[in-house]
Amino acid sequence: MSYDGYVDGITARLSLALDAELAEATALRHELHAHPELSGGEQLTRRMVLDRLPGTEVAEVADTGALVRIGGPGPAIAVRAELDALPIKEATGAPWAASNGAMHACGHDVHLAAVAALARCVHRAGGPMPLLVVLQPREETYPSGAKDVTSSGVLPRHGVRAMIGAHVQPVLQDGLVACDGGVVNAAADEFVVTMRGRGGHAAYPHLTADPVLALAQFAVSAQQIVSRTANPIVPTVVTIGSLRAGDAANATPDIATARGTLRTMSQTQRPMLQARLAEIATGVAMTHGCTAEVTVLAGEPPLRNDARLAEVTSRHLGGLGLGVGGPLHSCGADDFAYFTEVLPALMLFVGVGDGISMRLHDHEFLPPDHTVRSTARALLAGYLAAAEIFGERGLTAECGDLACR
């Protein structure tokens, strides 16, 4: 048997086994979507997924997360799926829509169902390497669940050689998968800037030190970080999402607060941008007779896909009937980035629309059910590629014919 023939054979076998799991996976997706749980409270979600997974080796991780090993001892390939939902009131009108004020508006229900389908497929049909399923909590908030998983040491203890993840992406055409090497998502830090002034009657501004005016100038001046501090060829974003000050129209408050996000695709540029943000806040505050307090909450690093893993996965995607789209790089962030810091890893972006009719984190976000199939196939492509690269004898581990190589 030739090497290519063997690869085609195992791909066909696993593809058929995967398709056999899709009805069960779709039912799981509906159940998960109807019962979303917020970050840190994903116990029911974890139980619903674990009840559908094979494997006898189950361990808790990161408080409400879990690890499930499929296959025997030895080096393994890991796949990640996120457990948490968002505090959004759903308005999709689906028969299985959530009604508890939370919502799977970022596709985590699809990711979980796809990972469950892959795990059952590998268990039933056999795979080239053991599979470690990582059910990760707290992707949408801090502290990061992925960071807790990596710092716990469980991945090296399970002999994990590579990590695969997938995320639905409405800006990418349905049926396409973006599979790029290098940095594909930005580092993301949150910041809080508090301007402290001297309040008083709005009719006597000369007797006050106005923190609202100081905060407004800061909000405008902070945009100069992008145009005058950041390297112009490195994608950088400063967005202020919250401004809060006072309660009365005729009174100047003592305090005004801004909250926002600072994002860059350069890890080395990150400390410089944080420092410049603080300098601008302090300088603007002094100009207005106020003081500034700046707190930066460091988030995930840039997400850097392994180039070799991306290259080989692209080939397997074609063999599984998926098109390769992209490149797709954005200043979005995902704590999957922590996995890319400690081992070869790949995040795949699975197209679910036309970029117009659906948006992530929107109360009407609802990818079609067939997205479970395309996401599961994308994960299968990554799993096969990782086994080919990092397996002790590549995909020929089952071949039995050294001429395959």
Question: Which role does the model predict for each range below?
Answer:
Residues 32, 79, 108, 133, ...:
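Divalent metal-coordination and catalytic microenvironments
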Residues 1-30, 34-36, 371-405:
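N-terminal hydrophobic/helix-forming segments and targeting peptides
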Residues 8, 15, 19-22, 26, ...:
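Electropositive phosphate-/nucleotide-binding environments in soluble metabolic enzymes
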Residues 65-66, 86-89, 93-103, 109-110, ...:
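Histidine/acidic-residue-rich, glycine-tolerant segments that coordinate divalent metal ions
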Residues 5-105, 109-129:
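Acidic/His- and Gly-rich active-site-bordering loop/insert found
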Residues 78-80, 191, 347-352:
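Non-cysteine beta-strand/loop elements that form the S-adenosyl-L-methionine
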Residues 216-405:
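Metal-dependent amide/peptide-bond hydrolase catalytic core
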